[in-house]
Amino acid sequence: MMTYYFIADLHLNESQPQITHQFLQFMQQKAPLAQAVYILGDFFDFWIGDDEQSVLISQVKLALKKLTASGVKCYFICGNRDFLLGQTFAQQTGIQLLADYHLLDLFGERTLLCHGDTLCIDDIKYQQFRRRVHQKRLQKLFLWLPLTLRIKIAQKIRRKSKQDKKNKSADIMDVNQAFTAQKVHQYGATHLIHGHTHRQAVHFEQNFTRIVLGDWRPDRSSILKVDEKGFEFL
């Protein structure tokens, strides 16, 4: 039976080894039996360039390479934490990078995939920040900086982001319903799968089904399994 897995918001980092362990277990036990695995952003807690090296990164690269070498496809859509993950990483691991929005035929259902941050248009400050950091010229300049300086800048941005979240209402950090429906209609989709909000749920909207992936924590994972029988969270 053909099976697809969807995950997002693992926020892999050295301070939470249990989450890395859970991911590696998933890669060893479930992923090898899949037709494809889709990682929908914020895979890493932050990513400052494909030249960064660590034990965690090496473990993840090895697991991805082993999976793709076995014939299982692995696709990646960047999130707001790992949008600098690039072609070098993709070549090293065998994953395929996708655009911000990707349309997939999933057992006859037109399914739209995205990280989810682009749907949260009510968070105006974040959307302004996103437009700036996605400028290719600015990214090129940042990646030109020494690795140690990039780490300091990323840590500063992350601290500010955490502080800003405390001052934002929960509503503006969720998707805008009208914009989301418009985007789904634009792609002619019947289903939408996204992450980012950390609010695992299935929403049966008027003309489509919206499936939200949850974030990973030391005590639980959020894995969406889709096969010809339907979908379920593991």
Swiss-Prot record:
It is an enzyme of class 3 (hydrolase). It comes from Haemophilus ducreyi (strain 35000HP / ATCC 700724). Mn(2+) 1 binds at D9, H11, D42, H198. InterPro entries: Calcineurin-like_PHP_ApaH (IPR004843), LpxH-like (IPR043461), Metallo-depent_PP-like (IPR029052), UDP-diacylglucosamine_Hdrlase (IPR010138). It catalyses: UDP-2-N,3-O-bis[(3R)-3-hydroxytetradecanoyl]-alpha-D-glucosamine + H2O = 2-N,3-O-bis[(3R)-3-hydroxytetradecanoyl]-alpha-D-glucosaminyl 1-phosphate + UMP + 2 H(+). GO terms for cellular component: cytoplasm; extrinsic component of plasma membrane. The gene is lpxH. GO terms for biological process: lipid A biosynthetic process. It is a peripheral membrane protein. PANTHER family: UDP-2,3-DIACYLGLUCOSAMINE HYDROLASE, UDP-2,3-DIACYLGLUCOSAMINE HYDROLASE-RELATED. This is UDP-2,3-diacylglucosamine hydrolase. Hydrolyzes the pyrophosphate bond of UDP-2,3-diacylglucosamine to yield 2,3-diacylglucosamine 1-phosphate (lipid X) and UMP by catalyzing the attack of water at the alpha-P atom. Involved in the biosynthesis of lipid A, a phosphorylated glycolipid that anchors the lipopolysaccharide to the outer membrane of the cell.
